[in-house]
Amino acid sequence: MRGRLRGPGATIAPSVLLEHMNKHLFPLLRLLADGSFHSGEQLGAALGLTRSAVWHAIRALEEQGLAPNKLRGRGYRLTRSVDLLVAADIAAACGASFRELKLEILDSCASTNTLLMEGARAGAAHGSVIACELQLAGRGRLGRQWQSGLAGGLTFSMLWRFDGGAAGLAGLSLAVGVAVARALERAGVAGVQLKWPNDILHGGRKLAGILIETGGEANGPGAAVIGIGINTRLDAAVREAIDQPVIDVAGLADPAPSRSALLGMVLDELVAVLTEFSRQGFAPFRDEWQRRHAHQNRRVSLLGAGKFAVEGDALGVAEDGALLLGSSDGVQRIISGDLSCNISLRDGA
């Protein structure tokens, strides 16, 4: 269940990276994934490549932080295992919910959200899911780039269609946060926190993020593309490139689940949450979200357009997902779409 980047998403600037990526990288990676030594001659025969082409593919692996061990007379062997996605394992972990989904696993792409937004406009089926081993231009909120490296995180998007349209999607990112938190707890990660409106934290460090893009009529049928990135096992180079404190599942769960198992659990929880959200909105998830609220009753500031906008006490969220901010002027309702929000503690906590 693997494919290549397709459609209009290939015209964006990061597609240049895809075009020049060594096309033999993933076939080579799968050959070496057994942990055994393979000679250059064996690799060339299996891949139909010259020794020179094998060398270039090896170099491509090194650029992804997967430099194989080379031993004269024996060949190449990966020094660490690579946790690639397996459709059958995802389906097993997802259970009965998997019947409602249509999963596609890509080796690499610019952005799963970009691909699925294009698919949504072209009539892609409800429940379509695109997951990717290596995302080259993953997007977060406010135009930030999501970084995880090859097989260092889960990067995937789901298309969910709603009869009620965009007007009924208030609080969707918070409900999705509840689904991700439930799945992480199933996977053995205790102490998951939620940050309004769309981050998953642990001990104040970012563990996962959500990006939702919508389309359709304000009061008619609509669709949401739900992009999720979860840090599963970040290498040192990726951590260094991220401009905020981060943590990964491998550092929190013992034993850590495979990426396939974790993806299956997240998809299962998403189907349950989105089905209920379609009927009742965010209200049924409000109390559960607030129990995990990272900044409940703390003094916070919200930043809009990169400068200080408003400060107050985070009192929780309303039934439509609005942040309730207490101040000397009373309680303000902050709607996710109104501000570019970056909640930061003001009391040193």
Locate predicted features.
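Alpha/beta catalytic cores of group-transfer enzymes, especially the acyltransferase/condensing modules
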Residues: 194-198
